[in-house]
């Protein structure tokens, strides 16, 4: 029997890569050092017994999720229906600015134009619409640079790509200034903070998040039976669906089992080492902290260029997350309210139904801690090219997660896992 493919890490990237590789016919073993799957999306219970998670309650860009489930078995809609859930369109986003003004912004293009025209006038609405249309060009370029194909180095950035990504405004801070409106400028700056970075150090093209939200909508997980609304907005249901998919595909999951090292022989991966001894590995997909991957798991002489690049990077800033009881929302849906300072620092509140009332989850970007699970902080455009590539310098070792060039959002993490699975599958076919 062939040696298994080993996946290190049971977060979103690890679950997604394992599901794809198992469906492709490989024997897969997943190792997770904690006692639960899901990473930062893992569900857990409060003292009150309510099941919560630290994931965003609103999901954007669902296509990667749908592709993942379709390519590993039953489609997403069918899998959720089997569990009693559905992925449904979410309501608009409400923003409260430093001066007390409020803006409820729908996701669709026409709705945004109408709301902004009514609130700020036609010229402001047109500037916003034109900006997001231009970001659509950047989005098309980014698809081939880490999202749907691997990004290796600067040679992939031809003149047309650089023009669509950068234009005249290099940072999100400059882009925010160009909109010439206090409120909308703060909205643009908030994109950087929600990515764990600063607007002055974040490339302007990171604002594509505004375009994808307008183009692909906002979504929430909710029960099929609306009277049973306790899990509305609990995004970790997707983790539970992925865990079920791994069981269906007979992926061996080892919880409470940390991997201490990856063994290389004759220039390629051959095994991993755990507390219980060595385990053979035909290939390894690593989805944990990138500094741990290259400084601890791999031998000291492996991937020297990536090691040097990582020394110039730092983890992203993760928000403080709290959960507290609140008044029940008027409808069985998630209500997202973002309080944004003049500088663009957001505090995100997700209010959703809970037993005997409501539950409010708060992501406070005024209080942050460095966290590799949240991705890599921007430090100018060049930092993007320093992110570890999906295909590492070590044959048979692949890296996927929020640190990948694709980006830290859930859909981007799922896409990086797809690239890792495809490259790993091709590698295994080439060596057999």
Model region roles, listed by residue range:
Residues 187-225, 392-395:
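Active-site-adjacent "gating/activation" loops or surface patches in catalytic cores
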Residues 231, 260-357:
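Mid-domain catalytic core of redox enzymes
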Residues 56-61, 193, 319, 402-413:
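Glycine-rich phosphate/pyrophosphate-binding beta-alpha loops
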Residues 3-140:
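N-terminal glycine-rich phosphate/pyrophosphate-binding loop and immediately adjacent elements
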Residues 99-103, 107-204:
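Rossmann-like flavin
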Residues 86, 252-256, 398:
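General small-molecule cofactor/ligand-binding pocket signal
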């Amino acid at each position: 029997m062939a040696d298994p493919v080993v996946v290190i890490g049971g977060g979103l990237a690890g679950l997604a890569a394992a599901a794809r590789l198992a469906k492709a016919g490989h024997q897969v073993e997943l190792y997770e050092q904690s006692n639960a799957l899901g990473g930062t999306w893992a569900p857990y219970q409060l003292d009150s017994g309510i099941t919560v998670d630290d994931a965003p309650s609103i999901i954007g860009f669902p296509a990667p999720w749908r592709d993942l489930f379709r390519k590993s078995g039953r489609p997403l809609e069918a899998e959720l229906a089997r569990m009693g859930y559905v992925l449904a369109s979410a309501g608009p986003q409400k923003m409260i600015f430093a001066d007390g003004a409020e803006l409820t912004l729908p996701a669709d293009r026409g709705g945004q134009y109408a709301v902004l025209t009514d609130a700020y006038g036609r010229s402001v609405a047109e500037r916003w619409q034109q900006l997001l249309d231009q970001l659509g060009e950047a989005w098309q370029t980014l698809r081939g640079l880490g999202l749907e194909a691997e990004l290796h180095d600067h040679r992939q950035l031809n003149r047309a790509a650089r023009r669509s990504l950068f234009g005249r405004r290099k940072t999100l801070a400059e882009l925010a200034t160009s909109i010439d409106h206090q409120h909308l400028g703060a909205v643009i700056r908030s994109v950087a903070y929600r990515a764990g970075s600063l607007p002055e150090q974040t490339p302007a093209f990171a604002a594509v998040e505004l375009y994808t939200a307008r183009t692909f909508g906002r979504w929430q997980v909710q029960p099929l039976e609306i009277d049973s609304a306790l899990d509305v907005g609990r995004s970790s249901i997707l983790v539970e669906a992925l865990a079920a998919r791994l069981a269906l595909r007979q992926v061996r999951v080892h919880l409470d089992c940390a991997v201490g090292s990856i063994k290389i022989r004759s220039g390629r991966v051959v095994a991993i080492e755990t507390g219980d001894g060595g385990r053979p590995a035909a290939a390894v997909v690593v989805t944990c902290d990138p500094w741990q991957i290259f400084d601890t798991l791999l031998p000291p002489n492996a991937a020297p260029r990536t090691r040097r690049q990582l020394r110039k990077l730092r983890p992203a800033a993760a928000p403080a997350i709290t959960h507290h009881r609140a008044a029940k929302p008027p409808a069985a849906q998630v209500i997202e309210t973002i309080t944004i300072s003049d500088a663009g620092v957001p505090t995100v509140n997700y209010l959703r139904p809970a037993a005997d009332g409501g539950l409010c989850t708060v992501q406070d970007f005024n209080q942050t801690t460095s966290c590799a699970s949240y991705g890599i902080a921007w430090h100018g455009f060049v930092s993007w090219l320093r992110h570890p590539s999906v295909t590492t310098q070590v044959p048979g070792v692949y890296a996927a997660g929020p640190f990948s060039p694709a980006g830290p959002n859930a859909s981007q993490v799922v896409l990086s896992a797809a690239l890792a699975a495809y490259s790993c599958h091709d590698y295994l076919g080439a060596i057999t």
